[in-house]
Amino acid sequence: MKTRLLVAVVACCVALSSGVRAETIMAGTAAGLDEDSIALQGQRVRLWGIDAPSVDQTCKRGGKNWTCGRDAARALSGLVTGKTVRCLVIVEDKLRRLIVGDCTLGGESLSRWMIRNGWAVMNPRQTDAYAKEEAEAKEAKRGVWASEFEMPWDWRIRQRMKGKAP
């Protein structure tokens, strides 16, 4: 009896220390919230691996200001709202938004779709998995790549320095 208990305790300790964690899957009817976040099961879910222009960010297209951030948000919302989305949760970030590795709609990655259509850029601090799609969007001048734009992370830093936290 003591041997079985000891084996069970050791097995649990090994399993807990192995770094393996259970995958958390969220699924349900989604709604677009902003340029890189959706609402799913009453929670805010941020798409993993991308950074899109903030809703207040503008780009220059044809010498004129263009609300590229607002259009990125509209594109994501139009894609997901009212549809069933499935997300694999990776980690909860310091802003208490869920970051997910693979949010899909009909088997297609939402992050990959946003990048392929030029509505977001790859977040190099998270992944380089979308490099091919980003290069193709840039070459085809899709979305923000058809304009002059500041990388979203640089734009946010500049806004903070001006005292306008996005």
Feature-to-residue mapping (PLM):
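Small beta-barrel nucleic-acid-binding modules, primarily SNase/OB-fold domains
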Residues: 2, 6, 13-166
